[in-house]
Structures are given as structure tokens and as C-alpha cells.
């Protein structure tokens, strides 16, 4: 594919793919590649602009990712974001001060040069999101300061060479006018053309699946979630009956999940094979408390189940997964400069060696794009807007060791939360809601009897893309009702808490 693109050089930021998403939203094709990609390869690409991403690293670290200076001689507009700006300053002879003026969260920015194309059509002050430990102390020669906060230089430019820097993150939804800044860079500075659409990409994906798979068969673990269902219908569109959907009952599912999954067979004419492996999964998780170990065990068990199926049908060659962009980002290892948050069983929990080839047709799309694809595929609202459920299931919502008793307790508590959300017309107003069971017991009193039982935590968030999220401010009356029902109806819980943590710094799931 030689479509002209905006190129994002990834220095390991968790937001690198989010930058790409923002640009694709305005109709411009975007590619994300590692910062260490050889300059020769970059020269051979058809690109109209380059963005240097942020990074968890410090420019002063011995292992800090750096950049070939020759990239600035390509006469292509360049925008550095956060670490990207700091590396520009360092390479051009400016001064970056280590840990001098850290800023995290919301800050007010003031424009010094309102004539710059980067800040065209913007007010002279607005709120932005900062996330940096190092700061610019001295800008390089031939650069000028475009904007500042009370604590740091917020933006610089070399207008002649079309090199720009931002200390803040315009790609994050909570940065005011971030979309406009990105548009200004893409259209006014890079002169990029609109050349990307979701519909066009869908046609391309279907063709790629047909070409890659050929006459071979594909198996897909169907979880009932949006991602796996969209993935299934997309692959079915490409290879029809050669898709075999496998529903593995791990015993770690939501209440009555097996019935809901099997209903999909008739709704969407899917070939679904049901396998009850609940005893095996639970036995393998015995005495395991570490969340990473739980994820990897579950990932391996899934593959074992699928590989046994392939022994029955030698024409099965591919294992399909509904892996999406945010899964990939959060599972990046430190080897690629990105701080690892957690491994997803979709990408980080699979064994290195397996006989099946991997097929991940959705791994370049964000959650809201997946939903749009689902709409185009005719998926019903109750399936399409169902709250996400992790591949490892309740194993990562039970903190610590997983037991059958804890699974039963959590299934009932989580079901009560879901019921009340529907009763109060709140379910579709929240992007994700679930209950976490803590390995913490506390004293309570019920009917003049002393109790010593588990603590449950309600987690509800709103988000556009699952890269950042805000906790949902639910009515106290609703929380009171849910808490009362859980404590009175679920044996084993005598205390309910509400999680009011946003992402970042917290992740949505607890493990």
C-alpha cells in the first residue's frame, strides 16, 4: 500500500496509536512504526508529515531512544510531542533539564506566537494535559517559543524547516483544542489530503483475509464480547463456512453467559462449537495469585483447547482473535521502549510456540472504530454495545487466588449491578461496569450475627477509546440500592466500595 501517510515514529508512548487514531478520524491515512526504523526505509515511504511520539524514558537515560539527525533533512514537516519535543531540543543543541519542573494532569497554556500555523484559529489560552518529568530550559538556535505554561516552555518551532514541538498531549481527549492543533499540523503544515475511510479499510481487510487464509479453515474463540463477535462476522464475510467459532466455557464467565453465547449461533448464522473446560481451567489456576501468571495460564489453556480441535480437522490452520489496538499497546514490552502495563491474553498470554498461525484482523482499530464496523455488519445494539469482558474473564476480577466459591460470589454480585443498570436506564450511558472481588475480609453485622466476609468493589467508567477513562459519577441512590442488594442477596460479601480512580493513573481492570 503506497497511500500517502502521516508517519508516527513510536518512542514507546502508550498514546502512539491514539495519535494515529486522531489523524485517521479526520480522514488521513496514518502509519505507526518504531523509532529505530532505518532512515532508508523511511525515505522509501510516501509520507507528508512525521510525528515523534512521547516516551516513558528520559532523554538523559543511558538507554534513551534517539533519532537519526538526517531525518530533519528530508524536508518533511515534523511534530514532536512531549519526549518527541525534548529529543528535538537535545539534538539541535538546546537544554533539557532533568526532573526540574514536573507536570502531570491539567495545565493552562498561553500562546506567545498566535500567528503560527500550528495554533491557527485557537484562543490565546486554554487547558491542556501534561505528563512529563523533564522540561525545556533553553531552546535551540533558530527555534522560537510558541507557547508556555506557568511552569514550562509548552511549544517551540523552527518555521523555516517546519519543525514543531509540543510539551503536552493534543491527542488526549481532555486537552482542549487538541483536535484543532492536529488538524493544523496535518492540513495546514503538511498539506495532507483526505485519503482514508473506515468503509474502504473494511473492504481491504476482507480481501486480505481471503488472500491470507485461502481455502484453509480458521478457528475463533467466541467470548460474546463486541470484539470477538465483530471479528467473527468479518472473517465469515471473507471465508463463509470455513470459520469455526469455538465457545470455551472456562467457568470464569458472567452469569448465564453460555446461554447468551449460544443464542448468537441462530442470530448471525455462526458455526459455534461448545466446549466445557471449566474444571480444567480452575485446576490450572489453583494456588495462583499473580495476575500475569493467571493471564498466561489462561492463554495457554485456550491454545491447548484450540490445538486439540485442529487434530480433528487438519484443514484448520489459523487461530483468529479479536485483538484491538488498545490490547496491543498495553501489552508492549519494555524491549520496545514502552512501559508494559499488563499482558492481554490476546497478545501477551499466548505461548511462543504453537502450531496455529495467528489472524488478528482488528488489531489496527480502536474500540469506537470496532463499534462502527459492527454497525456496518448489522450487529444488534444489545450485542454491539455490550460492556467489554476480558478474555481471562473473572480470573482477573478476583484479586488473588481464584476458587469456585469466589467465582460464584462474583457472578451473583456482578449480575446484580448489571440488572440495576438496565432497570435504571444507565447501562448504555456507561462504557464499562463490573464488580471486583477483593481478597480482603472485614467484620460486619447481619441480623445480630457477626459476619466476616469479602469486600466487593464496583467499577464504572466512561471513555471514548479505552486509552483514557473517567470514573462514572453515578447517583448515590443508585449506588445505595446496588450495595444493599449485593450485601443482602450475595452470601460472602458484607462490604461494597466504589472505585473513583481515572485512567491514567489507574487501569480500568484491576489486574
Curated annotation (Swiss-Prot):
Consequence of mutating residue 106 to R?
Answer: In strain: CA-11.2A
GO MF terms listed in the record are:
ATP binding; GMP synthase activity
Is Lipoprotein among the key words of this record?
A: no
Q: Which domain of life is it from?
A: Bacteria
> Which SUPFAM superfamilies does the record associate with it?
Adenine nucleotide alpha hydrolases-like (SSF52402), Class I glutamine amidotransferase-like (SSF52317), GMP synthetase C-terminal dimerisation domain (SSF54810)
Instruction: State the reactions this protein catalyses.
Output: XMP + L-glutamine + ATP + H2O = GMP + L-glutamate + AMP + diphosphate + 2 H(+)
Q: Which residues bind ATP?
A: 223-229
- Name a Pfam family for this protein: GMP_synt_C
Q: Which UniProt keywords apply?
A: ATP-binding, Glutamine amidotransferase, GMP biosynthesis, Ligase, Nucleotide-binding, Plasmid, Purine biosynthesis
Q: What is the effect of changing residue 182 to L?
A: In strain: CA-11.2A
Active-site residue numbers = 82, 169, 171
Note the InterPro entries from the entry.
Answer: Class_I_gatase-like, GATASE, GMP_synth_C, GMP_synth_GATase, GMP_synthase, GMPS_ATP_PPase_dom, NAD/GMP_synthase, Rossmann-like_a/b/a_fold
The GMPS ATP-PPase domain covers 196-386
**In which pathway is this protein known to take part?**
Purine metabolism; GMP biosynthesis; GMP from XMP (L-Gln route): step 1/1
Biological function: Catalyzes the synthesis of GMP from XMP.
Listed NCBIfam families: guaA_Cterm, guaA_Nterm, PRK00074.1
Put simply, this protein is called GMP synthase [glutamine-hydrolyzing]
Could you tell me the gene encoding this protein?
Answer: guaA
